[in-house]
Amino acid sequence: KEKVIVVLKDNAYGHGARLIASEAKKFGIKNCAVKSEFEANEIADIFENILILSHISTGDESAKFTYAINDIDALLKIKENTKINLAIDTGMHRNGLDISELDYAFEILARRNLELLGAYTHFRASDELNADYFVQRENFNAAKAKILALCDEFGIKKPIFHSHNSAALERASAVEDEMVRVGIAQ
């Protein structure tokens, strides 16, 4: 239960965020992810550990939440000392930092005293029976190795890693990361 992040974005995919959050809490789930700060505030009384996935950095972020960083611009604009997770693009090409941007990202997060709690990816089309999932998983393993080396270099505490969404969990024979994100799978 400590390894699960329940994803409640878009009103828990239309099923009711407060209802699903309450039920998840009853089962011992302690972590959740939502789309926006608005959604996070709706369930802040239920969960202490909330990751906001699609936030546009304003410099006015709340200390209550953890924010996903999807690009260098977000690192430059987010409020100093904010808790963050780095999104890593491993093949989805929609959001996340490219592995080639990690050196610069760490320079910024160290300079701005950002608290790196995690790093993650989202496996594109993990429900499709092709090699994409395996390629993306290897890309994430390379990114993890780079992140751990940069943490050592900059004296930053090792973050937790999470990569598997619901569909990827159905394909995985084992999960190598500290956490998984469970939302909805068909």
PLM segments and residue spans:
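Active-site-proximal beta-alpha core segment in soluble small-molecule metabolic enzymes
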Residues: 2-162
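Active-site loop ensemble at the mouth of alpha/beta enzyme cores that anchors a bound cofactor
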Residues: 170-186
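Active-site glycine-centered loops adjacent to acidic/histidine catalytic or metal-binding residues
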Residues: 9, 165, 183
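Phosphate-binding site of ATP-dependent enzymes
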Residues: 160, 165-167, 175
